[in-house]
Amino acid sequence: MKKHILSLVMALTLPLNGSGITFNIEHPKKDENGNFIQGRVLLFLSNNNLDEPRFQTNDKSSTAFVFGVDLKSKNSSKTIIDSKAFGYPVKSLDQIPPGEYFIQALLHKYETFNLKTGHTVQLPMDRGEGQRWHSAPGNYYSKVKKISLDPKKRKSIKIFLDQIIPEIVPPSDTKYVKHIKIESRLLSEFWGRPMHLGAHVLLPEGFDDHPEASYPLMIFHGHFPKDFGGFRTSAPDPDLEPDYSERFQLEGYNRIVQEHEYRFYKESTSNEF
């Protein structure tokens, strides 16, 4: 497992380039604000169309193939991915089995950070998606294309990154859940740009009726949650199609989640809580 995860990380981050099967990927030079784009170009190959290839890359045996190269020139609107590009779960395009593939490419944009330490680094800034490069707003990607590939035969394929991931609509405040965003002075000084901390706050029943009251605070540090989870004010959906949780090896896990979320709401707003 550790070996697979390391290979995936290297495919997403290591700079390389190269022939056999060649993908010519065309993308914008500048973003919508007129700035030269820096980042990494990723190519995905999947043997099925159950989902877009960019969403099928993971550390499981069923993962799609992914190959990556860095953008090396600000003046170029083309990137080549060939047999020299580092990949996962195989190292090279030369190692993929011949067959039919659904292909897609994506440009993961980087920002330049002038650190307080004096160093300058290029990194992908989170844009509200929780460091999920396949869904980061502002990233360019292509439509899915089906194609026949054989690494033993020379072939050149053009891909156009003519789609852009839209901005994420922030969650709305409700009676019980509020969302706050605070600019951090220390983080902003270190990174050389405004950096913010966010929080989703679950309020107790009767909070608005007692503005003078003080309440105990419990903090849970999640992993980039987009909203407060585990809490719903509506009853579980009786028509929800049960799914299978591979992680817990459990059928109907989504139904169980909704039941517990609603139970938490009912219990936490009751007079006995």
Where are the language model's segments positioned?
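Short, ordered, surface-exposed loop/turn motifs in non-cytosolic proteins
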Residues: N33-N48
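Short, hydrophobic/glycine-enriched beta-strand segments
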Residues: N24-I25, F44, F220
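A short, amphipathic beta-strand motif
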Residues: I21-K29
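Hydrophobic h-region of N-terminal signal peptides that target proteins for export
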Residues: V9-G18
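Exposed beta-strand and adjacent loop surfaces of beta-rich binding modules
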Residues: G20-T22, Q38-L42, E100, G198
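Non-catalytic cap/lid and distal C-terminal segments of serine-dependent acyl enzymes
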Residues: N47-N49, F55-F273
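Positively charged n-region of N-terminal signal peptides that target proteins for export
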Residues: M1-H4
